[in-house]
């Protein structure tokens, strides 16, 4: 099956492109002229991705056009004029606390799906990933970064906090103390440090980034879908289970997989 682009007005308005190729999907941030900044329309487009993926999709690559992965929130939203056709933050924050929390919840939905579903998500990050861009990269299961990649949680420097699930995802990757230091200082983390901290799974030259990420996707697809899905579920929830509960979950997951493997061996003999 050849790769094709999904036609969607919602995605186009948000500056997002979705490409499908059999068991693979590629989500592309496609507003390089705005440094792939996140507007309300971009969040809406990203939140819609799960409903646009056919059931045969097993891996999802998240990448960006241009020299920068994502500059974070589109700062035009902070001005009275805002982004054309969208509510400004001035208007949004004029509402009551519940309405503002609901708005934030909608943004969080855009970043929740990469880890929550059975598919494996891979983020390919080049250049800067700032604020929401950093948190989008963190939402993926695996990160491949270019040698020029750099990350920063800029929110605290602006007097706000990372609120797109990044505090938890970062803590799970690098631990409490390091996550707090990265967030509280808003400093930059380069590709080499990201690799050392476990933020990045692989580093590649910028011109080889997409190919390296696609190779990783292919390596996932080379293994049986049921086993990959089961192991993601086990690893994803391991930190929330005690050893006995995790052992029980492994036993339950293994039974149907073991039977299927043995049947396959028997069928080949």
What is each residue range found by the language model?
Residues 67-71, 130-131, 235:
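Short, active-site-adjacent cap segments at secondary-structure transitions
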Residues 64-109:
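Glycine- (often His-adjacent) and acidic-residue-rich active-site loop
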Residues 1-22, 53, 186-191, 207, ...:
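C-terminal alpha-helix plus adjacent terminal tail
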Residues 27, 31, 45-46, 62, ...:
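Terminal peptide-recognition signature
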Residues 75, 107, 167, 176-179, ...:
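A general structural signal for well-ordered alpha-helical segments in protein cores
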Residues 42-45, 103-106, 250:
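Hydrophobic alpha-helical membrane-association signature
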Residues 10, 112-226:
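Crotonase-fold acyl-CoA enzyme core
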